[in-house]
From Swiss-Prot:
Disruption phenotype: No visible phenotype. No defect in the positioning of ASI and ASH neuron cell bodies. No defect in the positioning of PQV, PVP, RMEV, HSN and AVK axons in the ventral nerve cord. Disulfide bonds join 164-211. Its main location: secreted. Pfam families: Ig_3. Glycans are attached at residue 43. This is Zwei Ig domain protein zig-7. InterPro entries: Ig-like_dom, Ig-like_dom_sf, Ig-like_fold, Ig_sub2, IgSF_CEA-related. It comes from Caenorhabditis elegans. The keyword Cytoplasm does not apply. The gene is zig-7. Residues 145-211 form the Ig-like C2-type domain. Residues 1-21 form the signal peptide.
Amino acid sequence: MKLINCISIALLCTLVDFSSAEITVISNLAVVGSPESHVGTPNKTLYANIQNLWCGAQNLGEHIDVEYGEFTRLSDGKVFKGTVNQGKVYLEIGKASVKVAGRYRCEVRTLDKEIHSGNLIIYMPPVLDFPAAVRVSEVLNARPPHVIGAERRGLHGERMVLECPVLANPEPMVRWEKNGEPLGNSDSIEYDGNNLILNSLTEDHIGKYRCIGDNSFPLFVDGPAIPHQIYFDQDIKVL
């Protein structure tokens, strides 16, 4: 039986293994990615600066050297061999795609050949990761981050899809507004995941649409969950 004991949400977590109760795994538990911008496409990888993850072991508060360690990304099972330095194991990240954000499991092997594990997470505030090339612009120094898309034009009776490809960790919530007001349900609109579909375009669809993506996570030791948002605006015209 195992129990995770998190001493602080941002700096230290221990995982107690009752089969060898003296051994605990320590780690930096959680790090926050800092995106270099807020828009990515297949031709423009969106990078973030991310601190290295690390894990170690201790016995009744005293450091125990580890001889090997690896990190598994839980979203896809991909395994990364860690670098051992001064008895701890590190996953060197630095500048990386925002898509590396998520939950990880660290497994360390101590000198007595025993394996111990703990969980870590890379947080990421909301960004936009488009599936194809787009014409958008970021509002300089906007808080929350604010992205403006190209004007969209459609013919009467056509169907139009407004994308909101928000990427974040934890998983973001997405909501839509039109002309600054929350967009409710009606026969003329529907939702496909985070995307908004305008059915049978009429003059009633004309306006400024905004998708808002938000998530929250703590930024410092024992701190509260801080909300993070991104705005994406699109002007719609009907011809």
